Amino acid sequence: GAPCNLTWREAGERERLWVTSRQHPIAQGLPDHFELETEEMYGEPFGVPEPLETVFISWFQGGEVFRSGLTYRRRAGNICYFRPGHETYPTYHDATVQKVISNAVKWAYNPATRIANPNDAPNTSIDIALEPLVERGPRLHHAGEKGFR
């Protein structure tokens, strides 16, 4: 994983979020920028993998900037990182923040067929191995017994 290291400050400062990817579905219906009057500051550098897209960049009253809206894809999943929000401040009551979260949920949804049983871990026989195989060593499971459940 990534260290996710960053600088931060709890000072209730103003945050201005700029939309940097106007055509992204997460930014649909949003103004070019919006402000949150009291927020916790996060500052660069931010130790995360390079995102697929950066949808928002924040500027804070103290002068710091931060990549506040990042997207990733992992296997069949879409992931959105959205920075604003602190237990001390009323961030989630802001209508624009609520719109971002709603858009992000819609964007992240993947209607593809789900894995029927994500805990299914079949114990396959050496008889169906691609190469000839001789069983060696102790066994934890009996032939045909399922593994992780």
Go through the PLM ranges and name each one.
Residues 2-76, 135:
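Catalytic beta-strand/loop cores that center a nucleophilic Ser/Cys/Thr
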